Structure formats: C-alpha cells, structure tokens
Regions:
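Carboxylate-rich, polar loop motifs that coordinate divalent cations or form catalytic acidic clusters
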Residues: 1-207
C-alpha cells in the first residue's frame, strides 16, 4: 500500500504485502485476505477493523453505505455485511463479487463473475438478474464486472459480452455490443469498468 504526494511527487509505503481491496469514504479502508483495516491518520498505521472468520476467504471489494454498514465482497464466499455495531450477516452466500455500487435511491447493485447481478433494495429484499437465452430483455451475461447510474436514473452494466442499460421503470435490459460497421459505437464488447464524471458523461473501460 503506497501513498503518492502530489506536492513532492514521491511515494511513501504505508503497508507491506498484498492488498486485495481498497475503498475510501471519509476514511481509507483496505482488505487483506479476510481482514479489513482502517487507516489511522494520527498514527500513520492501519488499525484492524474486522476479521472475517472462515477458511480460504479473500476480500475483493468494499463499500460503506450511509447507515455505516460495511459491505464486503469476496472472491468465492459471496457478500458479507457488517453493521456499525459489528453484527455480521451474509446476504449472498456464494460467488466471486466483482464490485459493489450504490445508486441514488440507496439500492445496492452487486456485480459477480458468474452469478449475474444482485439488487439489494432498501427493505433488504434481494433480486438476482441472470441471463435467460429465451428472454431478449434479460441481462446479456452472468459475468458482470461493473455498473453505474446515469443522470436519468438508468443503470449501465458492464459484462463480458456487452454493455447493458437497465431501466427500472420497465425492468428491461438493452444490449450494446461492438460492431465493425458502426465506427461511432463500442470498440470492444467486453466492458471492465464504468464511471460517471461531474458533467454526467459515462466513461467505459474495455478489456
């Protein structure tokens, strides 16, 4: 774990060893294997925040919601939720969690490598979107890497086989893929990451 000083243009090593997840929301959180650490600015050290009990658990991503629940994605054990008073639950019990996204309505969208897309509503109910070959309006693949909400409230979802736009009002997914005959379209159908800038423009990274 390294810190880069923009003024001095120098790096400072804060923590040795592998770091599996990094997240910032008021504080800097990192995941190392089955442990979550929080950076203590006053001491310059990383303090242990939580240890996930179990075998072969490796964290993949972190997210802190407005209720101070810490959501922890893993590489093979699904999704855990740690409340502010350190009560642990496991809303998703299996799968490799690629990313966690919170939209403007405070719903969570959980992207997975093989289990499709999970939607965790504010009432804690969970919906799982999977590809259905018989339904052209379903998500195009179960290998979901990232998602991002646009200014109109639509959710853009990056998968191994294309970009999906999900409209909450209709519950339908629209697919966008690369087409050599459309020079103004996607250059590659495999979408790795998505982000929205301050002007509302959606940026895509392909792989």
């Amino acid at each position: 774990m390294a810190e880069f000083d923009l003024t001095t243009q120098r790096f400072k090593t804060l923590l040795q060893g592998n770091v599996d997840a990094i997240y910032f929301n008021e504080k800097l959180y990192i995941g190392k294997r089955e442990e979550v650490f929080v950076y203590n600015e006053s001491t310059g050290n990383f303090d242990l925040y939580y240890h996930l009990a179990g075998k072969d658990i490796t964290l993949s991503c972190l997210h802190l919601d407005e209720k101070k629940n810490l959501w922890m994605g893993t590489t093979s054990n699904g999704l855990y939720c740690l409340s502010g008073d350190k009560k642990i639950s496991q809303p998703v019990t299996r799968g490799n969690i690629a990313s966690i996204y919170e939209d403007s309505s405070k719903e969570l969208w959980i992207c997975t490598w093989e289990e499709g897309l999970y939607r965790i509503k504010t009432d804690s109910t969970i919906e799982n979107f999977r590809h259905d070959p018989k339904n052209p309006n379903s998500i195009c693949a179960d290998f979901v890497r990232s998602c991002c909400e646009d200014n109109a409230g639509n959710l853009w979802i990056g998968t191994f086989h294309g970009l999906n736009r999900y409209e909450k009002s209709t519950g339908k997914f629209q697919l966008y893929t690369a087409n050599a005959n459309k020079p103004d379209g996607l250059t590659h159908s495999s979408i790795w990451c998505i982000v929205k800038d301050e002007q509302g423009t959606i940026w895509l990274g392909t792989y």
